[in-house]
């Protein structure tokens, strides 16, 4: 009889920080001229997948028939002075334009010869279904967006340039002169 060894994978697991899962956006009409970019001062992102199921009663019990999966992505950020992306996204909602969305996990770089700035991720296309700009006397202006996704998206390797990573969060900077 062969002895089977089991490992507790949690001993080797490492949690992914929320700051390392970034979302980039672009209006599909601008794909030829504009790179995807992050929202400035993002405080929260969320991706929800749901599926309704119809129930059919039989003599032997209920049979469930699943429907199509629905995907929704939300983003919340603090409004940055001069932010053009928020304006573009609001205009895209008003004009029913398709928005491209990339979800990239900066903790999972793709490795290989000649591969740089690629990370495991997902690609989506959809419409903005809700846009909210909230301002009160004590806090910064907050923008919340909800995207209704066409289909369920697709896994792939997402290019996130160093500049885009810097926009998403601080990236290590060395002590040497930058040339600026």
Functional labels for PLM-detected ranges:
Residues 45, 104-155:
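Short beta-strand and beta-hairpin "edge-sheet" elements
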Residues 1-13:
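N-terminal leader/targeting segments
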Residues 82-84, 154-157:
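Intrinsically disordered, low-complexity acidic/polar segments
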Residues 62-121:
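Structured, beta-strand-rich domain cores
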Residues 157-180:
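Intrinsically disordered, low-complexity terminal/linker regions enriched in Pro/Ser/Gly
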Residues 50, 98-103, 149-155, 170-174:
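Glycine-rich loops and low-complexity Gly/Arg-rich segments
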Residues 92-98, 121, 145-149, 165-169:
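Short, low-complexity, polar/charged sequence segments that are solvent-exposed and flexible
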Residues 12-78, 125-141:
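Solvent-exposed edge beta-strands and adjacent loop segments
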